[in-house]
From Swiss-Prot:
GO cellular component: cytosolic large ribosomal subunit
Source species of the chain: Exiguobacterium sibiricum (strain DSM 17290 / CCUG 55495 / CIP 109462 / JCM 13490 / 255-15)
Gene3D superfamilies: Ribosomal protein L10e/L16
Protein's name according to its UniProt entry: Large ribosomal subunit protein uL16
Subunit relationships: Part of the 50S ribosomal subunit.
Protein's GO biological process: translation
UniProt cross-references to PROSITE patterns, sorted A to Z: RIBOSOMAL_L16_1 (PS00586), RIBOSOMAL_L16_2 (PS00701)
InterPro entries: Ribosomal_uL16, Ribosomal_uL16_bact-type, Ribosomal_uL16_CS, Ribosomal_uL16_dom, Ribosomal_uL16_sf
NCBIfam families reported in the protein's UniProt record: rplP_bact
Top-level division of the source organism's lineage: Bacteria
The keyword rRNA-binding belongs to this UniProt entry's keyword annotation: yes
Length: 145
C-alpha cells in the first residue's frame, strides 16, 4: 500500500474539496486512463485494490501509472469513546481527488483490454469514473515548414 515515508505533522484538518482539478486532467504517460467525475477521498487500500484488479485482467501485460498518491492522514477515535478529549489516532492515508483528475493510466495493451481493465478498477473506487484516451493533437505537432 502507498503511504508517505515521513510527514511533518501526524494529524491534519479535513479541508474541503470545492472546485475542479487544476492539474493532471489529461492522459500524459500512457494511452488510456480513467478520470474522476466527482470529488472524494480515495484510501491507499482502494488504490491498491484497483491496481491489482487492472494488472490481473491484463495478465501482467502493458504498463500502469498511478497518478494519485495518499498524502493526507485521516484519524479515527476508538469505539465507545465519548466526544471530546482530543483528535483521534491516525488510521490510514487518503488521496484527495477532485473532478477531472486522471487517476490511472495504461499503455501497451489494446483499447478493448484497457477499457475493461479500467472498468474493473473503477468498480473498486468510490467515485464515478470516465474512460479517456490520449489526445494526439496537442503540443508542437505542427508539420508545416
Amino acid at each position: 500500500m502507498l503511504l508517505p515515508k515521513r510527514v511533518k505533522y501526524r494529524r491534519v484538518h479535513r479541508g474541503n474539496m470545492r472546485g475542479k482539478a487544476k492539474r493532471g486532467t489529461t492522459v500524459h504517460f500512457g494511452e488510456f486512463g480513467i478520470q474522476a467525475q466527482e470529488a472524494s477521498w480515495i484510501t491507499s487500500r482502494q488504490i491498491e485494490s484497483a491496481r491489482i484488479a487492472m494488472t490481473r485482467y491484463m495478465k501482467r501485460g502493458g504498463k500502469v501509472w498511478i497518478k494519485i498518491f495518499p498524502h493526507k492522514p485521516y484519524t479515527k477515535k476508538p469505539l465507545e469513546v465519548r466526544m471530546g478529549s482530543g483528535k483521534g489516532a491516525p488510521e490510514g492515508w487518503v488521496a484527495v481527488v477532485k473532478p477531472g483528475k486522471v487517476m490511472f493510466e495504461i499503455a501497451g495493451v489494446s483499447e478493448e483490454i484497457a477499457r475493461e481493465a479500467l472498468r474493473l478498477a473503477s468498480h473498486k473506487l468510490p467515485v464515478k469514473c470516465k474512460f479517456v484516451k490520449r489526445e494526439e493533437n496537442g503540443g508542437d505537432t505542427n508539420e508545416s515548414n
